[in-house]
């Protein structure tokens, strides 16, 4: 028994292990190219069953704690491995040994307390390595990256425990495109630790205090292109002029991101600009100036300019003591060489006139997302301000008058590019004044609803996208590029207004079609973006768009952004794929064919009616319908005649001289209704027939060859037949005056044929001895 229990326990463990591995493997989603996604799946280990077909594996944001030697040994073709944001604390020595094709490795934000160079000894082609956010204090006992000759991006360090950088740490690295070091609590930096890297394109350094900043700059200043300092408090920063005054420098750009300055440390940074002579561009992003701008008591007066800095960018600058700030006049002289200035989202409402006049080399000025208005712009664009300014960006400020804005900028004689988008102009005046060299104007997202002659005739590029325009009828003879997307235009502009237009972007309007003739009228048009409109996929439009093979060279967003809005059965389909039926595309031909068919049908109907007495049947039907509207049976008191006699006029002699004599002069006499004698004059003959039949007890039909040729006899027969069958009585009496061949009776006398087959009829005997019996039977039939 114990042995049986032991066997069952072993099988249960095996089954559970297999199910667990299967569940983890199924948590991955892999596409046919070998890209497998397993991020955020709550995995606690690397899934088993991975094969050589896996080329990219994302296991980030899970609960993996361990990477073993066998976990990835079959992934010999793996190029990308993401293991970031897990709980990995152990990586075995040969975990990545078989990944000889690996180019991207992310081990960031785990719990690695020790790093081993053996992990990377076979990763010769590795280009990207991220080790940020782990728990290690140093980069290992030996050179960690000496086996990575092709490494181009390296990220190391953490915000707490990483405190030391040693000379061996970066040995073996000669060129890096990007190096990011997170060392907020750096305490030890051994000189020349970064000097072994001969060329660094971009260095990002997270440093809380600037104590070791100058030592690091000394090592990298000759091998670095761009230096970015993040999350640093520079309150105590002091720049030593002797440190780099005699060294050649290659740094071209400095970036300060989330850095805090004081008035004193700002002066030290300005000194750095002077002594690192290669710096051409400086950027301050989300920085804080903890000062009041009082530089007069400092040594700033000994600095005449900002070195060789040509581009200055400031974004989201915070000045807590802004309302105590000085006029900055002491720094005005430093700005004379600056050519490009960007100050975004920093609550700037005024550029003092004196500062504008000192910016004598300025060619580009961007004051986007600030508080500039016409009143403050008047002071900023004063006389002699920005004398060489060519581009001015005032996007998303507080400008309201287009006319006044243009007038205030007349002092800028060299201005050719103006961006005043995202201001609330709402309307455009009929006339405006602009600087004489204006070539580019951006009025997008300004809520204007119409365009007028206010726009300068010298424009070459105009952007009026995202407004409320429903037409474009301006003549701009020099315009080369027009951006008018996201408006309410229903058609393309007239090409005669824009003779040299080469680029037009008119997507997201309500245009429903355009033709080959319209496009051909723009003789110099090379680029057209017209997608996202409500296209009516007519036959002409589809024929044009689908038949032009070269259309894709002009329509930059063709074919995906061109969708049908109607007809309904192709709505949502790409114009390129839409198909219409023959009837939709050749409607005139279809209508013509239908009309011809209808004409032939009417002609055929007429011929058939003539051949088969159709008109006769129609007349009879109308009379029959009239009869149907009358009461089915006349009341007894309304019966005026014993019998209505239906006969042909050609048989009148027999009726009037024989039958009338025998019946009306009999005792008691019968009262007969004859059309010659008893029909009411002036009344429609059909009504006379109907009324006479209705007021007669019986209807006598005198049948002969003449009878079947009489149209009125046919009416009388039909109305009598109506009574005979609809009222189920014996109202009809047939007298066969002469033998009639049933086959000779016309087809329209179908009811006569039916009556002769279903009712007994009286034959007029030629033998006079039998005639008395005939009259006797007739009288009996009338009385019945």
From Swiss-Prot:
A motif (ATG16L1-binding motif) lies at residues 761-778. Residues 609-784 are cytoplasmic. GO terms for molecular function: NAD+ nucleosidase activity, cyclic ADP-ribose generating; signaling receptor activity; transmembrane signaling receptor activity; triacyl lipopeptide binding. It is a single-pass type I membrane protein. Residues 525-579 form the LRRCT domain. Residues 1-20 form the signal peptide. There is a cross-link at residue 754 (Glycyl lysine isopeptide (Lys-Gly) (interchain with G-Cter in ubiquitin)). InterPro entries: Cys-rich_flank_reg_C (IPR000483), Leu-rich_rpt (IPR001611), Leu-rich_rpt_typical-subtyp (IPR003591), LRR_dom_sf (IPR032675), TIR_dom (IPR000157), Toll-like_receptor (IPR017241), Toll_tir_struct_dom_sf (IPR035897). GO terms for cellular component: Golgi apparatus; membrane raft; phagocytic vesicle membrane; plasma membrane; receptor complex. Ubiquitinated at Lys-754 by PPP1R11, leading to its degradation. Deubiquitinated by USP2. Interacts with LY96, TLR1 and TLR6 (via extracellular domain). TLR2 seems to exist in heterodimers with either TLR1 or TLR6 before stimulation by the ligand. The heterodimers form bigger oligomers in response to their corresponding ligands as well as further heterotypic associations with other receptors such as CD14 and/or CD36. Binds MYD88 (via TIR domain). Interacts with TICAM1. Interacts with CNPY3. Interacts with ATG16L1. Interacts with PPP1R11. Interacts with TICAM2. Interacts with TIRAP. This is Toll-like receptor 2. It comes from Bos taurus. The gene is TLR2.
């Amino acid at each position: 028994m114990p042995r049986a229990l032991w066997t069952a326990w072993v099988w249960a463990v095996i089954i559970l292990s297999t199910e667990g591995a299967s569940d983890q493997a199924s948590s991955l989603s892999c596409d046919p190219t070998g890209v497998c996604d397993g991020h955020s799946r709550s995995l606690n280990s690397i899934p088993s069953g991975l094969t050589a077909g896996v080329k990219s594996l994302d296991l980030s944001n899970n609960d993996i704690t361990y990477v073993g030697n066998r976990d990835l040994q079959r992934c010999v073709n793996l190029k990308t491995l993401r293991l970031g944001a897990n709980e990995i604390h152990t990586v075995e020595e040969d975990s990545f040994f078989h990944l000889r094709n690996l180019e991207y490795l992310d081990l960031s934000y785990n719990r690695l307390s020790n790093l081993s160079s053996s992990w990377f000894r076979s990763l010769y082609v590795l280009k990207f390595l991220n080790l940020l956010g782990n728990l290690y204090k140093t980069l290992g006992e030996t050179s960690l990256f000496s086996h990575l000759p092709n490494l181009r991006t390296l990220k190391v360090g953490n915000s707490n425990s990483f405190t030391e950088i040693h000379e061996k740490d970066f040995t073996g690295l000669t060129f890096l495109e990007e190096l990011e070091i997170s060392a907020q609590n750096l305490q030890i930096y051994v000189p020349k630790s970064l000097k072994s890297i001969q060329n660094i394109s971009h260095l990002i350094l997270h440093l809380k205090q600037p104590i070791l900043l100058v030592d690091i700059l000394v090592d990298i200043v000759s091998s670095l292109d761009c230096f970015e300092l993040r999350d640093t408090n520079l309150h105590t920063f002091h720049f030593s002029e002797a440190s780099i005054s005699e060294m050649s420098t290659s740094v071209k750009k400095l970036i300060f991101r989330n850095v805090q300055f004081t008035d004193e440390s700002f002066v030290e940074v300005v000194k750095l600009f002077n002594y690192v002579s290669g710096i051409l561009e400086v950027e301050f992003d989300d920085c804080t100036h903890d000062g009041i701008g009082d530089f007069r008591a400092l040594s700033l007066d000994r600095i005449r300019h900002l070195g060789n800095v040509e581009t200055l960018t400031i974004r989201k600058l915070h000045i807590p003591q802004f309302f105590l700030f000085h006029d900055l006049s002491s720094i005005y002289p430093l700005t004379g060489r600056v050519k490009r200035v960007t100050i975004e989202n920093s609550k700037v409402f005024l550029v003092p006139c004196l500062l504008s006049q000192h910016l004598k080399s300025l060619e580009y000025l961007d004051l986007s997302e600030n508080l500039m208005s016409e009143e403050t712009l008047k002071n900023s664009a004063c006389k002699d301000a920005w004398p060489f300014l060519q581009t001015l960006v005032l996007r998303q400020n507080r400008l309201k008058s287009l006319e006044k804005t243009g007038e205030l900028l007349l002092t800028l004689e060299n201005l050719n590019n103006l961006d005043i988008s995202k201001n609330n102009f709402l309307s455009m005046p009929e006339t405006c004044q602009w600087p004489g060299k204006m070539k580019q104007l951006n009025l997008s997202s300004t809520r204007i609803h119409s365009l007028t002659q206010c726009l300068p005739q010298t424009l070459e590029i105009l952007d009026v996208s995202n407004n409320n325009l429903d037409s474009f009828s301006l003549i701009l003879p020099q315009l080369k590029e027009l951006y008018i997307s996201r408006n309410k235009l229903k058609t393309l502009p007239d090409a005669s207004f824009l003779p040299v237009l080469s680029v037009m972007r008119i997507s997201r309007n309500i245009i429903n079609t355009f033709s080959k003739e319209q496009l051909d009228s723009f003789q110099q048009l090379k680029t057209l973006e017209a997608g996202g409109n409500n296209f009516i996929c007519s036959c002409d439009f589809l024929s044009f768009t689908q038949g032009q093979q070269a259309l894709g060279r002009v329509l930059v967003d063709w074919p995906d952004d061109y969708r049908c809005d109607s007809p309904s059965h192709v709505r949502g389909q790409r114009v390129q794929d839409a198909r219409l039926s023959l009837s939709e595309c050749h409607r005139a031909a279809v209508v013509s064919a239908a009309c011809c068919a209808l004409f032939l049908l009417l002609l055929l109907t007429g011929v058939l009616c003539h051949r088969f007495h159709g008109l006769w049947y129609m007349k009879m039907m109308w009379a029959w319908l009239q009869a149907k509207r009358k009461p089915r049976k006349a009341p007894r008191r309304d019966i005026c005649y014993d019998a209505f006699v239906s006969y042909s006029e050609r048989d009148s002699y027999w009726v009037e001289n024989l039958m009338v004599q025998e019946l009306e002069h009999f005792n008691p006499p019968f009262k007969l209704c004859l059309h010659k004698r008893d029909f009411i004059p002036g009344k429609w003959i059909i009504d006379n027939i109907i009324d006479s039949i209705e007021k007669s007890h019986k209807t006598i039909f005198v049948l002969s060859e003449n009878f079947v040729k009489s149209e009125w006899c046919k009416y009388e027969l039909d109305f009598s037949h109506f009574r005979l069958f609809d009222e189920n009585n014996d109202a009809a009496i047939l007298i066969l005056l002469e033998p009639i061949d049933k086959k000779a009776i016309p087809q329209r006398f179908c009811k006569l044929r039916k009556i002769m087959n279903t009712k007994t009829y009286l034959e007029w005997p030629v033998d006079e001895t039998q005639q008395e019996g005939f009259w006797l039977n007739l009288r009996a039939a009338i009385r019945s």
